[in-house]
UniProtKB/Swiss-Prot annotation:
Isomerase found in the keyword field: no
Pfam families: Auxin_inducible
Keyword annotations from UniProtKB, A to Z: Auxin signaling pathway
Any single GO BP term: auxin-activated signaling pathway
Superkingdom, taxonomy of origin: Eukaryota
Organism whose genome encodes this protein: Glycine max
Presence of the UniProt keyword Heme in the record: no
Induction remarks: By auxin.
Protein's name according to its UniProt entry: Auxin-induced protein X10A
InterPro entries linked to this entry: SAUR_fam (IPR003676)
Family recorded in the similarity comment: Belongs to the ARG7 family.
Amino acid sequence: MGFRLPGIRKTSIAANQASSKSVEVPKGYLVVYVGDKMRRFLIPVSYLNQPSFQDLLNQAEEEFGYDHPMGGLTIPCKEDEFLTVTSHLNDL
């Protein structure tokens, strides 16, 4: 019997908490900021070893290096592109 990995956690966090940097990050998740508005998402760390997510990480490295002033990982792509990638990962 397999386990289904939980998807990104943005939908389960109240809107006022999602914009707060002081929200605790659950074990097994990390914070990423995406898009022009730097929207905050919590993603499972298991996404980090997936090739499609690694492409996003490579974009982040090329644009920002290892300097991420928001306190979390900044991914320089459009929000809809990020949601497409993560929704495919959630289906795995």
